[in-house]
């Protein structure tokens, strides 16, 4: 969705002066060591020149690592999705008459207005790109539990943001062994005791976010026997991925010729699998394997990009996977600095994705409904969200609107204020940090508009790697309800047990999880690559079915970066871990059933989508959104 950069020029993204935007010396927005050229690159947010942000690139540690710093703001958030054509007979379909009855009985006639794809027209604020009700960040009909309206509540301003650090830790070489013993209630390990800084203090630009040593030194992963079976839906049959008993076997696999790769999906799958297996040996400094993998991917990618003018979703997904694997070979772990214009394009792609696919709406509204139902009890003055994947913060706009609607007296028992604590990994570039601060300012602005008292605190997820520095004082009072948003792909699998143990001590009212079909930390890296191929093929199919003109920008600025991020994170923690649901159970959490209201809300949401092919399935205590019987995302709730 090409946007004119000039339309956003003027006073800046939020119409704030540079002095007010960066007045707080505690924030990471002044870097005296950067060159003037880099200042000019990031200085213009959208209009006037702003000081260069101090970032993780500054190797400075906080003089007071455990000092807390708070700030009042608002929230937005993110995800993926698609559009479709057929419906299964065994599940709830988008076009089911029963759904029409449910929606009518619940008084959901205004949902069309909420979910319309109306554009803000000539609005001159990037905030409107994200917060526009037409892009799934608006307000649900009150009957849905997401009412509109605002009360006479002001948004207090108190700054608090704790920045990130680079904190070494002791890795787990085999997390599965620790969980097999039933006496182990939760996998736990002790990292070094050097105190981590809370703030986004930093290291060097090229330092990995999580520096990991080889989890299996001296062992060549290419020689492992992988005998996993995976269904590949294109052929509607079980396929066994190649298993290599030696590096020679992998090296002997022929690279697909231009005449066969485009016609036989199994060949493409085989080559991607073999390349991924070879890439797993790069930690052992095996140059031969690197060269072999690079050759396979280069030739495969060249063919995929030149095979036809109109590529199928499978071909496009395979091409993105190949590009991501090549980036791993070249150690391109840090994305280049983004320009303000690219940032606008990424936000525009995010908005287009939310309008094109019901994915974001399904995740956000289902999670928020569960949070409201668990936290909306008499006596709670405030809801405290602990978020491990804030994105652009769009998830919380409807929640703030609902809280604002209760202030006027419609729902007097409802909490009237909101606090957000964001746990984020150390930004690997100035761009990551820039986006985080951009989101923070968006949230502050929106909280002021709906007049909801709202605080935000930014903490390093690395604080949770050492129990000695756990911020257990996050709960401010007994009248504060705590809800956790923990997408499965938001943290490295090796860190999940410690994070769950920390959350267990906080005793949250609810933990909400979203799980995409490609988040497979329990599979070896090559198999995880194929899972990602299958998942993103299905996602692109759903987007193609919508016939949206913005599909290319969505794919370039949203889907492709998602693939790169997924594979990079999975490759950094190459060792397999137990399925995440087992980890939750081992750490003392039990699944909580989602309500009938949440299920009916999801069904009506998909029913009103113009593309047929999406449907909702209820699997045990979870709700699953599928595209033509293929899982796109699952939302579940957990309690301790």
From Swiss-Prot:
Region (VHIID): 350-422
Keyword Repeat: no
Locus of motif VHIID: 383-387
Subcellular location: Nucleus
Location of the region described as Leucine repeat I (LRI) in the Swiss-Prot/TrEMBL record: 266-331
All copies of domain GRAS, residue ranges: 259-639
UniProt lineage: Eukaryota, Viridiplantae, Streptophyta, Embryophyta, Tracheophyta
Function: Probable transcription factor involved in plant development.
Principal location: nucleus
Stretches the record annotates as Disordered: 68-98
Protein name, per record: Scarecrow-like protein 27
Superkingdom of origin: Eukaryota
Disulfide bond annotation, renumbered to this chain: none
Pfam families in UniProt: GRAS
Expression sites (tissue/organ): Expressed in seedlings, roots, cotyledons, leaves and flowers.
Family the UniProt entry places it in: Belongs to the GRAS family.
Gene Ontology annotations of biological process type: cell differentiation; cell division; regulation of DNA-templated transcription; root hair cell tip growth
Ranges of Low complexity composition bias in the record: 68-79, 86-98
UniProt region (PFYRE), positions on chain: 480-565
Gene Ontology cellular component list: nucleus
Sequence segments annotated as region (Leucine repeat II (LRII)): 438-470
